[in-house]
Amino acid sequence: MTNIKIILGSTRDNRLGEKVFNFVVEEASKNPNINVEGIDLKDYDIPFFNLAMNPTYMDNPGYTGDTDKLSKKIDDADGFIFVMPEYNHGYTGVLKNMIDTFYNEWRLKPAAFVSYGGISGGIRAVEQLRLVLIELQMVPIRASVHIPLIFNQIDDNGLLKEEIKEAAHLDATVEDLEWWAKTLKEPRESKLK
């Protein structure tokens, strides 16, 4: 079974991203070929990156606490979906810090994106994150979902509107991610032994 971790890259109070995150976790879980686990960064106390050396050059950085727990979850994954807002034409600082804290855990794994924001729907944040993930030897897939004007996409019950869910075509993105995760798994395990 393919393990997909869905990471919510916002920790703000009253964040709209939690609604998007719950939708993505629920929809991705409908795919019978993958195990899905949601990771809300708000649940982890990850200190600002402060290792003496870049984790790129370390086999065992000696993580403790929540950092160690998150390292194991990321290492266990075959692929990722980043659910993320756009802040000032970029992705969030909390997401950048979490990504930079790890290296080997990310290597040779695919990533998909579900972004949300104002008029752009978070596209600019995704474009920036793609560049960073390539440096980590990840494979950002082309398929992605962007939800514009997120503040107008919430219904009276505080949930993501049904028409937005249908228009997202998230299932196609999940299927692409599943294919990439399966395709990369054996070569990744062989190379990283």
Question: Where are the predicted features?
Answer:
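A generic structural signal for secondary-structure junctions
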Residues: 53-54, 103, 134-137, 182
